[in-house]
Amino acid sequence: ISEPSNPWIAGVASLFTREFFEGARARLAPGGIICQWAHTYTISERDLRSIVATFTSVFPNGTAWMVNDNDVLMVASLDPVVPMLGNIESHWSRATAAGNLAEVGAIEPFDVLSLFAAGPAELARYGAGADVLDDDRMRLEFSAPREIHNASTGDNDASFAAITQFDALPELVRSRRERATAAQWRGRADMMAKSDAYSIAYDD
């Protein structure tokens, strides 16, 4: 799991480069998964597309999950991720997994599957033509702080959401969304509300 601070912080942009992702890929064990955080708020669309393009240049099997309105998790493996989605349901009965997920409001597999936002083809389309970030061209380190007050979160949310149509979702995700009850959607809403709640670490 790579959840650095925002890329406008000095030195953090190096954790969004091709070299960083290549290093992560080299260390993945068979069946291992990388989860890379990104965000849609206070960032230009150009920079967000570059982050996605850089990630998919190393992990072409990458997928995207929206954990709330502003946070994106890009999840990838050495093997295609979409065929692994069924593991979410089959492994849910593990006490440790279910307990940990319940702490963040995910009570059943639908809660997690409903967060799926984009598959490899959609991510590739979103990042098409964007600059691939590398250690020799650390553009993000300079563009990110410059765009903090210029970027439109609403525009980024809309453009990112537009890359996936319902019919393009994996069959498992699509079928679970089609069959979801009102109670399940309310449970999802509760989970999303919980994801927006936070406390200062040193207050605990």
Segments (PLM) and residue ranges:
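Soluble small-group transferase modules, centered on the S-adenosyl donor enzyme superfamily
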Residues: 42, 63-204
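Glycine/threonine-rich flexible loop motifs
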Residues: 6-16
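A short beta-strand submotif of the Rossmann-like class I SAM-dependent methyltransferase core
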Residues: 1-2
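Conserved Class I S-adenosyl-L-methionine
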Residues: 21, 44-66
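Short "lid" loop at the C-terminus of a central beta-strand within the Rossmann-like core
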Residues: 5-7, 39-43
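Conserved beta-strand signature within the Rossmann-like core of class I S-adenosyl-L-methionine
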Residues: 31-38
